[in-house]
Amino acid sequence: EDGDVIRILEDGNAGSPRYEYVYDESSKSFKPKDEGQKMVVGTKYFALKAVNANYNFITVNEGKSIVELDLETGASDERGLPAIPLISDVFTADASGTVATMHHLCGVVEVPVNLSVEQAARKVTYFSIYSSDGKLAGKYTATPYPPYFLGTSTPSNTAYSEEKTTPYEAGDITVFIPVLPGTCTGVFLNVYFDGGAGGTYIDKDRQLVVERGKITKVTQVNY
């Protein structure tokens, strides 16, 4: 909307200068707040949505974004990163400051589910997948609602789907769960319903491989 603000952090540190781009409805684009607020042409930035609903952009450090380095090391929010969307992009600023050369931070697991009438009656609203070896969601935990924030909290081996406002109906449904890239085993599907939760193995002996920017589809789960 007109007047919406995009904030840009140069190096990801909380104390870094913050530049601002303001959305201009007439031109349908974000424009620098002033001449001193322009992104550097050719520089890579990382897009993340902050808690306050504005957008921050973090520069890439030697080929990897600050956020990606944090995911590898398990660092917390020392750089002022209150939340990281699982599905996000790295882009290079061009002359107009628009988005180019994107790639995804995570992959997505597609889980076909045949939900029984009995279970649907329990008002199922969201799902998660759990990995016995703890590699499924990296060192961060995701919230079960869009845009799938990665919170900087304790290590987690669980990743969540979107939480629906109305329960799933019985029958064949498809659940999409964003997951950090990697390989995991003993993958368990948790089903969350009104007042409790249940679960079933997707495939106890199967290795689940999640690739950046790709959808991994597993076999149907009957629940």
Residue ranges and their predicted role:
Residues 46, 108-112, 126-128, 176, ...:
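Beta-strand secondary-structure signal
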Residues 113-124, 179-211:
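Ser/Thr/Pro-rich, low-complexity mucin-like regions
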Residues 1-121, 169, 204, 211-223:
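Short, low-hydrophobicity acidic/polar segments
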Residues 88, 92-95, 109-170:
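Short helix-loop boundary/capping segments
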Residues 41-56, 129, 183-195:
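A short, solvent-exposed beta-strand micro-motif common in secreted/extracellular proteins
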Residues 34-37, 174-182:
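Short, hydrophobic beta-strand segments
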